[in-house]
Every structure is written in C-alpha cells, then in structure tokens.
Amino acid sequence: SQIVITHGTDTMTDTARIIANGNIEKTIILTGAMIPYKFGSSDGLFNFGGALAFAQSLPPGVYIAMNGRYFDWDKVKKNRKTGVFEEL
C-alpha cells in the first residue's frame, strides 16, 4: 500500500494536490530530479532512494520527497532560484 511516483518538478505539487483530493488510503510519494539524468550529476537517483525509504516509514498520505527530505503535499513549494523544495 505504498506508491512512489517519479514526476517532473515543475508540476509536482499540482499532481500531489489532485492525488490528495482523491482520498486514497495509501502512502504516496512523489519525487523527481532538479538536475536531469542526462547531465550525469543528477539528483534523481538520490531522491528516488529517499522516496523509497520514506514510503516504508510514513503513514498513509501524499508526500513529496526531494533533497533528502519529505514534505506534506500541501506544505511545500519549489524554489526555482535555489533549486530545492522548501517547506511553506
């Protein structure tokens, strides 16, 4: 009853909101990469690994996992200047 979704970061919070409004009783983690994989130094694999770990330990709900942290879907935003997701 855990789901990890890889997703583009520009609309990740929008997708998280839509999923959360569906009232699905699962632990759903969205994650992605701020640096595309093709550039070689992507953060995508690190974020994916974190998302897998968070999926095993968090209660049902919708979360975003980026930069070694997890956030409730409605308490996070992407900071395009710094290249990280930040808690609201």
Language-model segment annotations:
Residues 1-88:
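Active-site histidine-anchored catalytic micro-motif
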